[in-house]
């Protein structure tokens, strides 16, 4: 069994034979369901360099010894500024880390630390204990999402942004579901702040019977 806990915004904890964190933005996150010091991790996946996605990754990695997986440029930037942490830099494509299959895939978004552009944005398809999960990162919908289903499907769970303004809104995310054909979908990256206000029920209605939409509140867990 794999457990997926929504930590608020775009942050998730995935627990099976390994503990994985994705975009652990907790400090300063008004929707955060945990504190950085409460979390353990073997791997931390970062989708891009914006502060609401890198978040507390370095702090958690220093304390737990977790390996940080990120775009090559971001991985180098982090290790150069935080000696002692372990990073795995990628530039799209598949790899395997400690028994976890990871595919870093494109996302349509910018990636910077607020001053400098650092690498590209990405999403991840991960396979843990036979369960396939797609975290889209921050992105707009794009036609090549079809390839993720063709290459790595069936996807058991898709984690998709629906807040608009910086990412897909409900309409675009529903189209992404049509392209990805996942079994289950959890919306994310909405209602953290006013610019990304969105109604998850609208998204659920638009998806219809194309997938099972599960609306998680921060702190809630989905078992797969």
Curated annotation (Swiss-Prot):
The entry's keywords: Hydrolase
Pfam assignment, any one: Lactamase_B_3
What's a single GO MF annotation on this record?
hydrolase activity
Q: Can the keyword Hydrolase be found in this entry's annotation?
A: yes
Which protein family is it in? Belongs to the UPF0173 family.
Protein name in UniProt: UPF0173 metal-dependent hydrolase TON_1314
The record lists the organism as Thermococcus onnurineus (strain NA1)
């Amino acid at each position: 069994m794999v457990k997926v806990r929504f930590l608020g915004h775009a942050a998730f904890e995935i627990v099976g034979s390994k503990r994985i964190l994705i975009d652990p933005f907790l400090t300063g996150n008004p929707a955060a369901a945990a504190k950085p010091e409460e979390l353990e991790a073997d791997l931390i996946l970062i989708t891009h360099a914006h502060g609401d996605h890198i978040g507390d990754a370095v702090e958690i990695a220093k304390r737990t010894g977790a390996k940080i997986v990120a775009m090559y440029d971001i991985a180098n930037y982090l290790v150069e500024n935080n000696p002692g942490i372990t990073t795995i830099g990628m530039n799209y494509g598949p790899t395997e880390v400690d028994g976890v299959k990871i595919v870093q895939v494109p996302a349509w978004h910018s990636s910077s630390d607020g001053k400098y552009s650092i690498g590209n944005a990405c999403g991840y398809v991960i396979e843990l204990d036979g369960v396939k999960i797609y975290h889209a990162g921050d992105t707009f919908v794009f036609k090549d999402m079809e390839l993720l289903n063709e290459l790595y499907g069936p996807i058991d769970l898709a984690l998709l942004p629906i807040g608009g303004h910086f990412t897909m809104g409900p309409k675009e995310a529903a189209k992404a579901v049509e392209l990805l054909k996942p079994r289950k979908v959890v919306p994310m990256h909405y209602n953290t702040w006013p610019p990304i206000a969105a109604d998850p029920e609208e998204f659920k209605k638009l998806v219809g019977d194309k997938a099972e939409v599960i609306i998680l509140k921060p702190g809630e867990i989905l078992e797969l």
